[in-house]
Curated annotation (Swiss-Prot):
This is Sec-independent protein translocase protein TatA. Keywords: Cell inner membrane, Cell membrane, Membrane, Protein transport, Translocation, Transmembrane, Transmembrane helix, Transport. It is found in: Cell inner membrane. Its main location: membrane. The chain crosses the membrane at residues 1-21. GO terms for biological process: protein transport by the Tat complex. It comes from Phenylobacterium zucineum (strain HLK1). The gene is tatA. Residues 45-70 are annotated as: Disordered. One of its GO terms (molecular function) is protein transmembrane transporter activity. Gene3D superfamilies: 1.20.5.3310. The lineage of its organism: Bacteria, Pseudomonadati, Pseudomonadota, Alphaproteobacteria, Caulobacterales. Part of the twin-arginine translocation (Tat) system that transports large folded proteins containing a characteristic twin-arginine motif in their signal peptide across membranes. TatA could form the protein-conducting channel of the Tat system. The Tat system comprises two distinct complexes: a TatABC complex, containing multiple copies of TatA, TatB and TatC subunits, and a separate TatA complex, containing only TatA subunits. Substrates initially bind to the TatABC complex, which probably triggers association of the separate TatA complex to form the active translocon.
Amino acid sequence: MGSFSIWHWLIVLVVVALLFGGRGRLSGIMGDAAKGIRAFRDGLKGESEQAEDETAKPLPKERDKDSARG
């Protein structure tokens, strides 16, 4: 139980190769995740600004009934 078999080492080797092998796959994955999070936050920010713009519009001035007569 204290020693690792060849299968344990093979699995560890595959995981390490997937994470750190090639052209910086881990950094590429993390960069894509960061871009996704940033886009999500920007989307939420845009929706809240749009909602504020809709609620912040001034109401048109209504004419008094007396001044409309002339």
